[in-house]
């Protein structure tokens, strides 16, 4: 840390005011919220505003989790939206302060810490934050399960945000990914499902860009995918299916020797009771159909694939109820747009889905967290959202229709 950053200390009055604003931020009164937002907007103009936020988040352990998490989220947003205005001294201060937060005992605070570190890595770049990469790498092997999970979660976020920059990073002639890829492969067998998912999610980012570090470990990765194919957690199987799609599009020759087994697995997974797993498996057939090098292997399997796709196209009872008021137009001739799927082509559609996730606050990462929520209760809003998804979003039925059109 620079001398200026090391010698920084807050003004007591300013720190006290900020903490009080964060305490009040839980109020539901509109006028209180308006006043807090106005005051924070004014305070955010001071040069060391970020230092105050990180100090409250990391060091003020006597405050409520809600108070500290507000400070942390504001720090993350300030970094993300105002990076050019943040001084090198403030960046150095945050780099020094934030890494110990990976071992916070509170889940909310740890999650906020992972977000701050991921954004900070985007701002300063991996090659300029060797300590950050080194700490994450070491923490992945921590005996503290929470710290290890936080480190893997952070690296998954960074991998999603900047895979090319991680791949290009060299430090004193060494590529960090040459060390990290084997470590991630090992983590896919971890007893904790969260860690398995973070590892698979990270590795998938480097498959997509054709990373040399990934290429050197592809045989090991394909073996890992086969090992995790029957994982008890649907979200792990979802990432296995996603990985197989990426391998098929990038290194199809790696699957060729075991293609019969892969086909059997994907047929089974396309009928998985978890629709997220089934949808990812269905994407595999889209990629399969578009890969001319595999046409000879696809053709003999069509008699088994097509009935599965037709079965998956059947409307659910809920969908039929939703369409009950739609006018019957069976006597009217179909237009081309009625027949041709709106999302056509596996590669194109996957790009749309990836862009959607990146442009909407990292939905994929939020989905990972949501899938570990054991609360199966639905409220009315969640049911409405589900109905909207069925009506308008890409789903298993539409994917299978697209496949048959292909």
Pin down the residues of each PLM region.
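Hydrophobic residues within the alpha-helices of tandem HEAT/HEAT-like
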Residues: 25, 40-44, 74-82, 116-123, ...
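HEAT/HEAT-like alpha-solenoid repeats
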Residues: 14-19, 49-60, 64, 85-102, ...
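Short coil/turn segments at helix-helix junctions and helix-capping linkers
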Residues: 5, 20-31, 58-67, 97-109, ...
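Acidic, serine/threonine- and proline-enriched intrinsically disordered linkers and terminal tails
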Residues: 4-5, 306-402
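Solenoidal tandem-repeat scaffolds enriched in leucines and small polar residues
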Residues: 124-213
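Eukaryotic helix-linker segments that join adjacent hydrophobic helices
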Residues: 62-117
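N-terminal alpha-helical scaffolding segments that mark the starts
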Residues: 2-53
């Amino acid at each position: 840390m620079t001398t200026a950053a090391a010698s920084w200390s807050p003004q007591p009055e300013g720190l006290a005011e900020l903490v009080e604003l964060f305490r009040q931020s839980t109020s539901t009164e509109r006028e209180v919220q308006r006043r807090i937002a106005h005051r924070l907007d004014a305070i955010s103009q001071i040069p060391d505003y970020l230092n105050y936020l990180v100090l409250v988040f990391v060091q003020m352990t006597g405050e409520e989790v809600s108070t500290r998490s507000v400070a942390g989220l504001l720090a993350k947003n300030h970094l993300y939206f105002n990076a050019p205005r943040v001084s090198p001294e403030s960046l150095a201060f945050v780099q020094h302060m934030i890494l110990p937060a990976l071992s916070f005992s509170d889940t909310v605070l740890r999650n906020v810490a992972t977000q701050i570190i991921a954004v900070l890595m985007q701002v300063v770049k991996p090659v300029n934050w060797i300590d950050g990469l080194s700490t994450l790498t070491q923490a992945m092997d921590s005996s503290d399960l929470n710290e290890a999970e936080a480190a893997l979660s952070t690296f998954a976020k960074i991998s999603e945000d900047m895979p090319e920059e991680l791949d290009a990073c060299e430090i004193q002639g060494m590529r960090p990914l040459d060390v990290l890829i084997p470590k991630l492969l090992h983590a896919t067998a971890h007893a904790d499902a969260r860690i398995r998912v973070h590892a698979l999610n990270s590795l998938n980012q480097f498959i997509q860009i054709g990373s040399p570090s990934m290429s050197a470990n592809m045989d090991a990765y394909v073996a890992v995918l086969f090992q995790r194919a029957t994982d008890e957690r649907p979200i792990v199987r979802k990432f296995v299916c996603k990985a197989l799609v990426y391998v098929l599009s990038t290194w199809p020759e790696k699957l060729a020797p075991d293609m019969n087994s892969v086909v059997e697995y994907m047929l089974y997974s396309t009928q998985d009771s978890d629709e997220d797993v089934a949808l990812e498996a269905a994407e595999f057939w889209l990629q399969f159909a578009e890969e001319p090098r595999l046409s000879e292997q696809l053709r003999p399997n069509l008699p088994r694939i097509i009935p599965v796709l037709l079965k998956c196209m059947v409307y659910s009872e809920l969908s039929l109820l939703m369409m009950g008021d739609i006018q019957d137009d069976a006597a009217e001739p179909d237009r081309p747009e009625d027949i041709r799927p709106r999302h056509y082509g596996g590669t194109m559609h996957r790009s749309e889905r990836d862009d959607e996730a990146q442009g909407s606050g990292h939905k994929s990462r939020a989905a990972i967290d949501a899938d570990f929520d054991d609360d199966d209760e639905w409220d009315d809003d969640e049911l409405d959202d589900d109905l909207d998804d069925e009506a308008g979003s890409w789903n298993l039925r539409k994917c299978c229709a697209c496949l048959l059109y292909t």
